[in-house]
């Protein structure tokens, strides 16, 4: 792992597992965006929660990190952070987690104590034409590699994009044949050179003249680093984010109840 990556992710994980950043609404169900997606405008995430509420009345919010970066970058700290997260979820009475992030979905399933539901099939059943506020238009789709075997989520995302009036050009490799963005298991920090090779290979599958849409904000961040235009599925549903970053994450965090 390079030094700058180590310092940056070390600070990220320390902040993510600090008390002010770990907020979970009291109740049986929460919407869990994940670290990267909390960088979008909070209004987009609130619209997402409202649509999920049609399936899960009273659903709350979680601003927590799943801890996957610590698993691969700081294994000595991972177990303690996982226990801290488990105690908070137990204290707040959480039983069901509606996860937006593919990596969070996998990590939270590993806890073994909660029903973890990807949000995409739920949204596909409960978002209507009247909810759409995105720009529509042509795009190409990147299926995140953690979702490679999840045909239900893949098809749900495509139904949502059709509803949002997106003219989709499929990647050369998609669905179960998708390729990694170069950051699986924190590869960008652990081996930047290998990560870049993987990312360039994946970008070769995606038509150069089209914006890349995905349901993983971490993947999109990697592609933006290579100069590609990107947009998250939630932005195509509920409006484009005017900014990205920790300011938005903090604003979202304040909506949760400690």
Question: Where are the predicted features?
Answer:
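Alpha-helix C-terminal capping segments
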Residues: 50-54, 89-91, 107-112, 127, ...
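A short, acidic, amphipathic alpha-helical segment used as a generic capping/interface helix at domain edges
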Residues: 86, 191-211, 215
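Short cysteine/histidine-rich zinc-coordinating motifs and their immediately flanking basic loops
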Residues: 77-79, 192-195, 228
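Local cysteine-cluster metal-coordination motifs and their immediate loop/turn environment
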Residues: 33-38, 62-75, 98-107, 142-153, ...
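Iron-sulfur-cluster electron-transfer modules
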Residues: 1-113, 248-258
């Amino acid at each position: 792992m390079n030094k700058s990556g180590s310092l940056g992710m070390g600070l990220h994980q320390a902040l993510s597992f600090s008390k002010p950043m770990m907020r979970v609404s009291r109740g049986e169900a929460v919407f869990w965006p994940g670290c990267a997606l909390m960088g979008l405008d909070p209004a987009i995430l609130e619209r997402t929660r409202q649509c999920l509420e049609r399936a899960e009345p009273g659903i709350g919010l979680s601003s927590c990190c799943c801890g996957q970066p610590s698993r691969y970058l700081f294994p000595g700290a991972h177990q303690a952070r996982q226990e801290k997260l488990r105690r908070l979820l137990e204290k707040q009475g959480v039983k069901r987690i509606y996860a937006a992030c593919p990596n969070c979905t996998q990590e939270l399933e590993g806890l073994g104590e909660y029903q973890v539901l990807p949000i995409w099939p739920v949204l596909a059943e409960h978002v209507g034409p009247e909810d759409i506020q995105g720009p529509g238009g042509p795009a190409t789709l990147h299926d995140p590699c953690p979702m490679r075997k999840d045909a239900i989520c893949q098809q749900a995302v495509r139904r949502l994009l059709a509803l949002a009036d997106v003219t989709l050009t499929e990647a050369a490799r998609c669905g179960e044949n998708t390729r990694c963005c170069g950051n699986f298991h924190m590869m960008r920090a652990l081996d930047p050179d290998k990560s870049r090779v993987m990312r360039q290979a994946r970008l070769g599958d995606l038509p150069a003249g089209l914006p890349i849409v995905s349901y993983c904000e971490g993947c999109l961040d990697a592609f933006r680093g290579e100069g590609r235009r990107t947009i998250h599925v939630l932005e195509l549903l509920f409006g484009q984010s005017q900014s990205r970053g920790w300011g938005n994450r903090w604003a979202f965090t304040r909506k949760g109840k400690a």
